[in-house]
């Protein structure tokens, strides 16, 4: 291995904290959007975003050139242009809100006690910064709550592109999106199925505080506690919900849903299926994030099967790809 290649390994495995912080600045100032209408000199970018010293902006932009986020002109040094990557993180792409959420400062603070969490075998994240749990951050920090909501919208927008043709809701009368936040997922799906009615079901705090609730004539926003009861329906959606909880809590939730399910009802779970033959970086990252924020976890297919068997369900269909999903029904 060449010397330069060896040092690239150091960057890849030891310097991620710098990457996260640098990218946070890029997203905070929407720099990817600034390049969408054409190349710009770093001094112009610096002026737009309000840096006091242009040279610091140059070093920020240059840092991301070998990472293929930006391109620097070889003819006009200091002039930067967009790449396919940067477009994805602009308003013309689908990843801006999701990326901005994941690189925020709160997540960075939680990561500082990851070694303790791993060594002790118990979540140390929220308590390390004086929180009783992760949800307290959403309740008390308006900025983070908005970034959380935006992040969920961003993820939903991204997967909606790939869901078409994967799942079919046409045979159902009522579909409930459990933990649906703003209702963007179920609301968007209703546009595809004119005979389906939708219910967006989430906590009172979420339902009555979201400024971006999806409006649709066949969609109701209902507040409640899904660990107590859920609305009756013949189909339920759960997007990235079960990963937030332990197996025991997931069993509890599934059994509560079971009580309200109509005959032949289905539950559609949009969540990661970890595959040891093709682990993806983002999937394993999310597993660690769940561990550090909620004591949750991502699951392999065998873990999903075990969870469903414990809860009185069976898998009717699943796909491990993009996106991952499982369709289950009562045994």
From Swiss-Prot:
<dbReference type="InterPro" id="IPR016461">
    <property type="entry name" value="COMT-like"/>
</dbReference>
<dbReference type="GO" id="GO:0008757">
    <property type="term" value="F:S-adenosylmethionine-dependent methyltransferase activity"/>
</dbReference>
<keyword id="KW-0949">S-adenosyl-L-methionine</keyword>
<feature type="binding site">
    <location>
        <position position="226"/>
    </location>
    <ligand>
        <name>S-adenosyl-L-methionine</name>
    </ligand>
</feature>
<feature type="binding site">
    <location>
        <position position="239"/>
    </location>
    <ligand>
        <name>S-adenosyl-L-methionine</name>
    </ligand>
</feature>
<dbReference type="InterPro" id="IPR036388">
    <property type="entry name" value="WH-like_DNA-bd_sf"/>
</dbReference>
<dbReference type="Pfam" id="PF00891">
    <property type="entry name" value="Methyltransf_2"/>
</dbReference>
<dbReference type="GO" id="GO:0008171">
    <property type="term" value="F:O-methyltransferase activity"/>
</dbReference>
<keyword id="KW-0808">Transferase</keyword>
<keyword id="KW-0489">Methyltransferase</keyword>
<protein>
    <recommendedName>
        <fullName>Probable inactive O-methyltransferase 11</fullName>
        <ecNumber>2.1.1.-</ecNumber>
    </recommendedName>
</protein>
<feature type="binding site">
    <location>
        <position position="225"/>
    </location>
    <ligand>
        <name>S-adenosyl-L-methionine</name>
    </ligand>
</feature>
<dbReference type="InterPro" id="IPR036390">
    <property type="entry name" value="WH_DNA-bd_sf"/>
</dbReference>
<comment type="similarity">
    <text>Belongs to the class I-like SAM-binding methyltransferase superfamily. Cation-independent O-methyltransferase family. COMT subfamily.</text>
</comment>
<dbReference type="InterPro" id="IPR001077">
    <property type="entry name" value="O_MeTrfase_dom"/>
</dbReference>
<dbReference type="InterPro" id="IPR029063">
    <property type="entry name" value="SAM-dependent_MTases_sf"/>
</dbReference>
<dbReference type="GO" id="GO:0009058">
    <property type="term" value="P:biosynthetic process"/>
</dbReference>
<feature type="binding site">
    <location>
        <position position="179"/>
    </location>
    <ligand>
        <name>S-adenosyl-L-methionine</name>
    </ligand>
</feature>
<feature type="binding site">
    <location>
        <begin position="224"/>
        <end position="226"/>
    </location>
    <ligand>
        <name>S-adenosyl-L-methionine</name>
    </ligand>
</feature>
<dbReference type="GO" id="GO:0032259">
    <property type="term" value="P:methylation"/>
</dbReference>
<feature type="binding site">
    <location>
        <position position="202"/>
    </location>
    <ligand>
        <name>S-adenosyl-L-methionine</name>
    </ligand>
</feature>
């Amino acid at each position: 291995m060449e010397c330069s290649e060896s040092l690239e390994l150091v960057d890849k495995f030891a310097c991620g904290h710098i990457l996260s912080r640098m990218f946070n600045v890029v997203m905070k100032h929407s720099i990817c959007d600034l390049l969408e209408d054409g190349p710009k000199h770093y001094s112009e970018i610096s002026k737009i975003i309000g840096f006091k010293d242009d040279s610091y902006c140059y070093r920020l932009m240059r840092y991301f050139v070998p990472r293929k986020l930006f391109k620097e002109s070889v003819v006009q040094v200091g002039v930067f242009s967009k790449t396919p990557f940067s477009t994805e993180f602009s308003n013309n792409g689908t990843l801006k809100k999701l990326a901005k959420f994941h690189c925020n400062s709160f997540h960075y603070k939680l990561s500082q006690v990851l070694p303790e969490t791993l060594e002790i075998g118990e979540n140390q994240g929220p308590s390390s910064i004086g929180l009783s749990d992760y949800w307290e951050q959403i309740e008390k920090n308006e900025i983070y709550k908005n970034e959380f909501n935006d992040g969920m919208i961003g993820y939903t927008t991204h997967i909606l592109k790939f869901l078409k043709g994967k799942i079919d809701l046409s045979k159902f009368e009522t579909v409930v999106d459990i933990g649906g936040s703003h209702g963007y997922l179920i609301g968007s799906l209703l546009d595809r199925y004119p005979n389906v009615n939708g219910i967006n079901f989430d906590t009172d705090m979420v339902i009555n505080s979201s400024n971006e609730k999806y409006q649709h004539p066949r969609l109701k926003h209902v507040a409640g506690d899904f660990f107590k009861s859920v609305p009756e329906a013949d189909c339920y959606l759960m997007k990235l919900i079960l990963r937030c909880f332990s197996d025991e809590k997931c069993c509890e939730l599934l059994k509560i849903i079971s009580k309200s399910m109509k005959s032949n009802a289905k539950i559609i779970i949009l969540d990661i299926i970890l595959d040891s033959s093709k682990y993806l970086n983002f999937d394993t990252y999310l597993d660690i994030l769940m561990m550090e924020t909620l004591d949750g976890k991502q699951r392999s297919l065998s873990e999903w099967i075990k969870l469903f068997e414990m809860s009185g369900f069976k898998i009717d269909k699943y796909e491990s790809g993009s996106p991952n999903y499982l369709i289950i029904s009562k045994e």
